[in-house]
Amino acid sequence: MSADNEDYYDEDPYGFEEENAPITAEDTWAVISAFFREKGLVSQQLDSFNQFVDYTLQDIISEDSTLILEQLAQHTTEQDNISRKYEISFGKIYVTKPMVNESDGVTHALYPQEARLRNLTYSSGLFVDVTKRTYEAVDVPGRDLNYQLIAEESEEDSESGKVFIGRLPIMLRSKNCYLSDATESDLYKLKECPFDMGGYFIINGSEKVLIAQERSAGNIVQVFKKAAPSPISHVAEIRSALEKGSRFISTLQVKLYGRESSSARTIKATLPYIKQDIPIVIIFRALGIIPDGEILEHICYDVNDWQMLEMLKPCVEDGFVIQDRETALDFIGRRGTALGIKKEKRIQYAKDILQKEFLPHITQLEGFESRKAFFLGYMINRLLLCALDRKDQDDRDHFGKKRLDLAGPLLAQLFKTLFRKLTKDIFRYMQRTVEEANDFNMKLAINAKTITSGLKYALATGNWGEQKKAMSSRAGVSQVLNRYTYSSTLSHLRRTNTPIGRDGKLAKPRQLHNTHWGLVCPAETPEGQACGLVKNLSLMSCISVGADPMPIITFLSEWGMEPLEDYVPHQSPDATRVFVNGVWHGVHRNPARLMETLRTLRRKGDINPEVSMIRDIREQELKIFTDAGRVYRPLFIVEDDEELGRKELKVRKGHVAKLMATEYQDIEGGFEDAEDYTWSSLLNEGLVEYIDAEEEESILIAMQPEDLEPTAVEQDIPKENVDLAKRIKVTHHATTFTHCEIHPSMILGVAASIIPFPDHNQSPRNTYQSAMGKQAMGVFLTNYNFRMDTMANILYYPQKPLGTTRAMEYLKFRELPAGQNAIVAIACYSGYNQEDSMIMNQSSIDRGLFRSLFFRSYMDQEKKYGMSITETFEKPQRTNTLRMKHGTYDKLDEDGLIAPGVRVSGEDIIIGKTTPIAPDEEELGQRTAYHSKRDASTPLRSTENGIVDQVLITTNQDGLKFVKVRVRTTKVPQIGDKFASRHGQKGTIGITYRREDMPFTAEGIVPDLIINPHAIPSRMTVAHLIECLLSKVAALSGNEGDASPFTDITVEGISKLLREHGYQSRGFEVMYNGHTGKKLMAQIFFGPTYYQRLRHMVDDKIHARARGPMQVLTRQPVEGRSRDGGLRFGEMERDCMIAHGAAAFLKERLMEASDAFRVHICGICGLMSVIAKLNHNQFECKGCDNKIDIYQIHIPYAAKLLFQELMAMNITPRLYTDRSRDF
């Protein structure tokens, strides 16, 4: 070690000399930093997509790899006796880097920023090795065909080569993306923000995220009780899904008939494609297990368990009639869907169902009947244990029994469907060419659009499935990435969704379950109908991508697992059942040692670390899961320490030192000889371990490293030395822990990790802030100036908060903050801050407090109609253009675009465009000889104004001219704008006072904000006050205040520090009235608090209308601010007016101010059939030959419309006036 390194170690505060010392709370943060440095915050998206591209794609193609078409000899002539067999096989798949094909045929690399600006799709080409072979055989009657491959010389007969089959959208920062290995300077050149984390797709220029979809795991047996009226008391069910491949699901239910009271309680099973429930004994016999004794042995593993055997008696009697396999198969086959077939066919049908559809996850090959029989027995065993009340029913909401489908599985499912469709089309083309005796052309056979547009459609619309079946497919799987604030983007990438109907009133799936601890954020979930169904991952939780179970199964067989085929239950009653991914593979006599070995292998890295192993000692089961979609999180491993004679963390000071050395080297290019010691090193040395929800139930976790130390009682520390104010008390289990939390604050997700002291708030307040933090303005990315987003808000002077949390470091909240530290007084002053409004200092606003930029982009392109007609960007002239808009066209240049820097206001035209009119169109009679074009320009939104910031002219994929215009506005805080602290304390500005009207302290400090004291007590946001206190200390001392949750920081401690700086320890100050200068008669809580400006601004909401546009159909005012609509006088308002008795006002609102209409009615027939010539004052109802008895009435136009619609339905509403009644 060189000298300068030694210095580095000497001045180190951690005391690294003691390599083996236990780590402190501070050291755990070094471990967390290592985790995020390696994993990042969206690793679950990237890993899943990489797995898909690297492995799943090839699996899907290999699964459907060969198409065979046989053309039998036609025997039209003597010589025509040759049968041919055509075979197309798909080989390896290749994925290029992202490319774009321009309209002029040039192909070049496509970088993400260009894709965003030009509305392209960031996607790679897929190429597959396709081999076409032709075989021939001479067809001799009475003999099987013997195909020979035709001689290879003639190249036509055997073609092979890479063939383009479609385009795959690429996830940003995945292995196939250009940004995956770009350095910071590369990113700068590509105009990408180094903070952008990837994990999303770019489809037609818009950024799309795939939301993780939650589902119940397949291949697990679950037992449920049925409610009273049902004839079935208990049911055991399993949803078998094949390990990889078609996600084809087949459900098996084993039902216990009869309630508790009834005598004969039989057990029957529901088989797929069989109409009736089949008694289980018959299924066993169909599987080839004939004697009653053997059947019972498959179900009941203990011969002396008379209760269970008693319950099985009626079942044995139920199947007594059928005593051999043939009859049993026939019994099942008879109840199949196909009717009227012969016995052999029926038996074959039943065999096929038992082989392919019955428990397909065990195997779909034949000859494994005994394994399926044992599994069926196991299901019945579980059912009976529940029925005998020895075991509770299963919990549907247990998070370990759930799986999250991320980008990988979702795309796999879609790609499989599309690839099937493609192969079908190729097969059809083969048939056509063979029938018409044409040449087979690979380019024509493969329609690459199938896959390209299929994937693009699903990602663009979020309807996951084929276009034709849009109704049946899931909606909202792909969403537009939220780019409001950096943290809202991060949070969106870590969101999960449960596809249950939102209107379901079921509370259970929405509740926070114990098993969510550490995996799902307890605070961050929306309010309202999606509450608890949309969740967000905790900071350190990851999702498994799936590992191959084969090595583990092989290992088990070598390590003394007896295969299921040889299992005889009464010989080894204590054997433990071994399951891998829900398949029962065998039994083991020494599970403790086996578990020890498996754990050791996983901690060494010989078994994939994301595999989970659970030994359920009570149930005598050992379950191993390697499948994709399990949520897991890292924990420290605790083991016995020989020297200390107690449990101790395996991670030591020395390891932390190495981690920090590596980090130091990364950041400052420190000493080179330090080995790279990363998170993976910790994993492979068995210091940390991944635990999922299922395995978590078999371990005991300490909350902090301190919990492992012997408690005060054991050490006989005198009572007075025990700190009673310490927030986190020590527990007494120090002997049995197996793991330890890395840090308890890691149970929170992205949005909740920004809240200071969330452990001091009432829980719904944290939920409110988690939702509001996503609407705060800040800097969403550093390259916002190069982006043309539809909308963007940028805060002028964002600040990092004075009260920070440790997790903010990983959320880059200091680099890209979303708020400012305002000086806040909590006081009643002038009464303009009642009901969650607040008083803001106008002078601070003038100096730039909470000012923000607002960008909006407008987009247009020259569309093509048919071959000849194309729109053009130009400045429309009134002389030759029809239907021009009201706004001014003067600001356009001759090319139809506006120059940057021009000030624009509502309805000004910013993109001029015309469409040629076909010569034969009339255009509703407005057209004259000169008019050759129609206006198709884009005006600025009527309610906005600003300055043109940037204009981009380019071409889109079809080579058409395409333009984006970005308009910039400055938004200054004003009365009605919404702000919030980080504790769900939201409010609007009630009034702004200039500095001289605000109260001031003895030091002459004036607050920026005054909030009302009534906002605090009922909401119990104590953290708001503690944050203020801490920020005050931070501002005085010049350090950041640490407001992380679950630490030892107390109000007591902060108060002490504040006192040392010479302030009142609880943050109170004497203030003076700004109007009179008199001392205020109360001490006022005063200090800095971090406030966020939210996106709801009064200028975007203010709306009024006198007269304006009407709907065409009902002639009532249109709806909505953007269309200058009216304000609806609704049903409830109507009821109030009736209650007030204000009838004339009611009529005025609902008729005169809306859609009053004059009609003439005939006094005889009461219909609106009168022909009125008003200028001649002539009226006539032709049907009644009536010219005199005619009345003019005023009714709402909507009523007139209703009457006419009723007439169209042959219902005649007749209108009579009082006078016409008298006639």
From Swiss-Prot:
Gene Ontology CC annotation, any one: pericentric heterochromatin
Gene Ontology terms for molecular function: DNA binding; DNA-directed RNA polymerase activity; ribonucleoside binding; RNA binding; RNA-directed RNA polymerase activity; zinc ion binding
Region (Disordered) residue spans: 1-20
InterPro entries per the UniProt record, alphabetical: DNA-dir_RNA_pol_su2, DNA-dir_RNAP_su2_dom, DNA-dir_RNAP_su2_hyb_sf, RNA_pol_bsu_CS, RNA_pol_bsu_protrusion, RNA_pol_Rpb2_2, RNA_pol_Rpb2_2_sf, RNA_pol_Rpb2_3
Keyword annotations from UniProtKB, A to Z: DNA-directed RNA polymerase, Magnesium, Metal-binding, Nucleotidyltransferase, Nucleus, Transcription, Transferase, Zinc, Zinc-finger
Residues where Zn(2+) binds: C1162, C1165, C1181, C1184
The enzyme's E.C. designation: 2.7.7.6
Any one biological process term the GO annotation gives: transcription elongation by RNA polymerase II
Subcellular location: Nucleus
CDD domains on file: RNA_pol_B_RPB2
Binding annotation for Mg(2+): D836
Catalysed reaction, written as an equation: RNA(n) + a ribonucleoside 5'-triphosphate = RNA(n+1) + diphosphate
Residue ranges covered by zinc fingers (C4-type): 1162-1184
Enzyme class (EC, first level): transferase
Presence of keyword Zinc-finger: yes
Family membership: Belongs to the RNA polymerase beta chain family.
Function of the protein: DNA-dependent RNA polymerase catalyzes the transcription of DNA into RNA using the four ribonucleoside triphosphates as substrates. Second largest component of RNA polymerase II which synthesizes mRNA precursors and many functional non-coding RNAs. Proposed to contribute to the polymerase catalytic activity and forms the polymerase active center together with the largest subunit. Pol II is the central component of the basal RNA polymerase II transcription machinery. It is composed of mobile elements that move relative to each other.
Extra remark: The binding of ribonucleoside triphosphate to the RNA polymerase II transcribing complex probably involves a two-step mechanism. The initial binding seems to occur at the entry (E) site and involves a magnesium ion coordinated by three conserved aspartate residues of the two largest RNA Pol II subunits.
Quaternary organization: Component of the RNA polymerase II (Pol II) complex consisting of 12 subunits.
Name the UniProt record assigns to this protein: DNA-directed RNA polymerase II subunit RPB2
Organism: Candida glabrata (strain ATCC 2001 / BCRC 20586 / JCM 3761 / NBRC 0622 / NRRL Y-65 / CBS 138) (Yeast)
